[in-house]
Structures are given as structure tokens and as C-alpha cells.
């Protein structure tokens, strides 16, 4: 559409809203000792020797209730999770990628990126491993934004951005993977594309109402519809967030990660943000999740066939985090020296 470039910034904001992911899940009360193992898909890295230490599981007591097709990790890639009418109206995969690429171009113009290959290759490898074990039908491009703000977002078509602040906030690789799996699930389920389709339908409805009402009353109706209703779709619905939780937990499990780590990461970030408001981005913490959403997500994980071992962390994660900290400290030292020079000059 001709007016898409003008609305690109708004769309980027809409697509990037993490919408409650911080409070997506609560940590389970059950803890059992567990030995971690190297994720087999990460063995392709010539420089990575995964070093793991025992940490407690976070999944609750096992359940024998049968899994539905959309709940079963064994059905990943074999099922259709986009069967709704809105998804069908949202167009082809090619259209999704095209729209995402245009929005990503705006992000690329405005953001500053981490270019250190050790960091970018590691984050890309973790993300691509999850994509490989997901329902996504588009290729993913993953970049690390040089920002201390805790955030991550994925645009339609698989254009995925992870902030440096998120890497620093995670205590292990599984926690990072939990956030990435949730975002990959939003793309796999086409949530942002569906949001845009809903917004377009509302625009058409508002236009029709303005024609029907006519004159100034119609113009007022059109303007309020555009401001109020479109704002509703600049964030994911509770249903979309719950679906991303459940799909993301399946993707973590399939990729070899402890699915409970998603709970610990989001709960940790929520607690830190309560102690220090602004710790995470406003978009990242838009909607606190109710306890039943947390419980249902972890209850689903308890119904998966139990792995003897899960990946929790790796020596490479620790090296990447240490390097990010060194880069951040060096920058802070340089900035302080410049400020001191300015003050004394």
C-alpha cells in the first residue's frame, strides 16, 4: 500500500511489543537436582565446548493427561497452527516477509548493533536452533542491538532483534532461550501479521462508517476509531500471549532446554522491574500475566515426556556475557573520562 512507509515506525512499535512476556509464566514450586547436557545442535560450533553444572528443574509434577496436536512437541512442523480466518486473510508467506523486511529496514536505520562475531554468532546459533525445532515457516535473521534496555522482539517474516540488556539479564543459556522461544512462537503463529490485518479491517470499517454517517460526525467517528481501536492492536492479546507461551515451551523442550527456564527468566525480570522500575523496557513489560496463565504454561510442560537431562547453560554463554560486560565497562570508563575532561577543561 502506498501509505505503508509513512506508517512503518508505528508498525515497528506494534510488532515489537513483547506484550507481557516478562510476566508470562511463574516458576514452579518443584525443584529436583538435574545434570545438564550439551545441546547436540550446538556441537557444530568449532569453538564451543559446553560446560554445564547441576541446577534444579522448574517443571511441576508429571501428568499423564493426553496432549492435543497443538500441545504436543512431537507434532512440531507437522501441524497447522495458523488455521484461523484472520490468518488466512493475512496473505501469503511472501507478503509477510516483505512487510517484515520493510519494518526491519526502519529498525536497522535507527538501532546501533553489536558486531562482535563471537557475540552475534552465539546468539544466532541459539536462536536458529530453536527455529529449527519450531513451527516457523520463514527463515530468521537475528541481530543483537547495542542497548542496555532489556528487550527482544521479532517482526513478521523472521526479522528478530535481541538487546544486549537481555543477554546481561539472563543467568544462563536456557533463560535466554526461553525469551527467544516465546518470540519465535509469535512469528510461527503469525500474531503480528494478524494484528495488522485486524487493524486494516478496522480502518476499512471506520472509513465505511464515516461515509455512512457523513460530514463532521463521520470524520469524528473515523478519527476516534483510528486512534482508539488501532491502539488496541498495537499489543498482543492475552490469547496470543498464551499461545506464544505454550508454543515457546514446546520449542524449548524440543531443542533440549529445560522448559521451566522460561518461567524463571520472566519471573526474575518481573521481580527486578518491581524493585527498580524501568529495569526493562515499557514494551517488554506491558501486561503482567495472571497466575493462571503462568500455571497453565508450566502444567503443559509437566505433560511432556520427561528428559533425563536438559541444557541449562554453556561455557560459551558465560564467555559471551563476560565479553559484553567488559565492553560495557570499557564504554562507561571512556565516557567517564570524557566527562571528566570536559569538566576540567
Where on the chain are the PLM-derived regions?
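A Zn2+-metalloprotease active-site environment signal
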Residues: 9, 27-345
Amino acid at each position: 500500500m502506498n501509505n505503508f512507509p509513512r506508517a512503518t515506525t508505528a508498525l515497528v512499535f506494534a510488532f515489537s511489543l513483547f506484550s507481557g512476556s516478562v510476566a508470562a509464566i511463574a516458576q514452579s514450586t518443584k525443584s529436583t537436582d538435574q545434570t545438564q547436557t550439551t545441546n547436540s545442535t550446538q556441537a557444530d560450533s568449532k569453538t564451543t565446548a559446553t560446560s554445564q553444572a547441576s541446577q534444579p528443574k522448574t517443571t511441576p509434577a508429571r501428568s499423564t493427561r493426553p496432549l492435543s496436536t497443538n500441545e504436543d512437541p512431537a507434532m512440531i512442523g507437522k501441524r497447522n497452527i495458523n488455521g484461523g480466518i484472520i490468518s488466512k486473510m493475512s496473505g501469503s508467506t511472501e507478503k509477510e516477509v516483505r512487510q517484515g523486511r520493510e519494518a526491519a529496514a526502519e529498525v536497522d536505520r535507527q538501532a546501533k548493533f553489536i558486531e562482535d562475531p563471537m557475540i552475534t554468532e552465539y546468539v544466532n546459533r541459539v536462536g536458529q536452533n530453536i527455529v529449527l525445532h519450531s513451527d516457523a515457516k520463514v527463515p530468521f535473521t537475528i541481530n543483537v542491538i547495542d542497548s542496555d534496555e532489556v528487550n527482544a522482539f521479532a517482526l513478521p517474516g523472521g526479522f528478530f532483534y535481541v538487546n544486549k540488556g537481555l543477554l546481561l539479564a539472563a543467568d544462563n543459556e536456557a533463560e535466554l532461550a526461553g525469551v527467544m522461544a516465546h518470540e519465535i512462537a509469535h512469528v510461527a503463529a503469525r500474531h503480528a501479521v494478524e494484528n495488522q490485518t485486524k487493524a486494516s479491517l478496522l480502518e476499512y470499517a471506520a472509513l465505511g462508517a464515516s461515509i455512512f454517517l457523513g460530514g463532521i460526525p463521520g470524520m469524528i467517528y473515523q478519527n476516534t476509531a483510528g486512534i482508539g481501536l488501532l491502539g488496541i492492536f498495537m499489543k498482543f492479546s492475552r490469547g496470543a500471549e498464551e499461545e506464544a507461551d505454550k508454543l515457546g515451551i514446546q520449542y524449548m523442550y524440543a531443542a533440549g532446554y529445560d522448559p521451566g527456564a522460561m518461567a524463571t527468566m520472566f519471573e526474575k525480570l518481573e521481580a527486578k522491574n518491581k524493585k527498580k522500575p524501568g529495569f526493562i523496557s515499557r514494551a517488554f513489560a506491558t501486561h503482567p500475566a495472571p497466575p493462571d496463565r503462568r500455571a497453565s504454561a508450566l502444567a503443559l510442560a509437566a505433560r511432556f515426556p520427561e528428559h533425563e537431562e536438559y541444557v541449562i547453560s554453556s561455557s560459551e554463554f558465560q564467555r559471551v556475557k563476560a565479553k559484553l560486560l567488559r565492553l560495557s565497562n570499557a564504554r562507561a570508563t571512556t565516557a567517564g573520562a570524557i566527562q571528566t575532561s570536559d569538566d576540567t577543561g
